[in-house]
């Protein structure tokens, strides 16, 4: 459950380390986002010589949440921290590597590039 002003870790090598959600996309009344949802983020912390810099505004897809994700079989999966992958205008990842596991729900949302780059899909 990601709300506006929630801080997230970045799970790729785009150069950003921490981002803050500034808008949940998908309708004017939408207040929260979960795994697989696209949000608008502002880069709060970045490494030198990265592809993005502090203050940049990008779209991102949520790949891990600390709030449990319920599945159809009754199981739930949760992570220690919230994490996102930054996207460009064509909804493709900015980075070329993904760090840490991602959830299977991304496959249904057509984020195949992220699924293929991830070291583990849970």
Swiss-Prot record:
GO biological process, one term: translation
NCBIfam families: rplN_bact
Protein name: Large ribosomal subunit protein uL14
Complexes and interactors: Part of the 50S ribosomal subunit. Forms a cluster with proteins L3 and L19. In the 70S ribosome, L14 and L19 interact and together make contacts with the 16S rRNA in bridges B5 and B8.
Family as reported in the entry's similarity comment: Belongs to the universal ribosomal protein uL14 family.
SMART domains: Ribosomal_L14
Keyword tags: Ribonucleoprotein, Ribosomal protein, RNA-binding, rRNA-binding
Organism whose genome encodes this protein: Gluconobacter oxydans (strain 621H)
Gene this protein is translated from: rplN
Gene Ontology CC annotation, any one: cytosolic large ribosomal subunit
Gene Ontology molecular function terms on file: large ribosomal subunit rRNA binding; structural constituent of ribosome
Pfam families documented for this protein: Ribosomal_L14
PROSITE patterns according to UniProt: RIBOSOMAL_L14
Keyword Ribosomal protein: yes
InterPro entries linked: Ribosomal_uL14, Ribosomal_uL14_bac-type, Ribosomal_uL14_CS, Ribosomal_uL14_sf
Known role: Binds to 23S rRNA. Forms part of two intersubunit bridges in the 70S ribosome.
């Amino acid at each position: 459950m990601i709300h506006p002003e929630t801080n997230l870790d970045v799970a790729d090598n785009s150069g950003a380390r921490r981002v803050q959600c500034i808008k949940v996309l998908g309708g004017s009344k939408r207040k929260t986002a979960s795994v697989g949802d696209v949000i608008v983020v502002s880069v709060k912390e970045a490494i030198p010589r990265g592809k993005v810099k502090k203050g940049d505004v990008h779209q991102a897809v949520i790949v891990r949440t600390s709030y449990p994700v319920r599945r159809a079989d009754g199981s739930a999966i949760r992570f220690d921290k919230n994490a996102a992958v930054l996207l460009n205008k064509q909804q493709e990842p900015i980075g070329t590597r993904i760090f840490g596991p991602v959830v299977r729900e991304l496959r249904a949302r057509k984020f195949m590039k992220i699924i293929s780059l991830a070291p583990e899909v849970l």
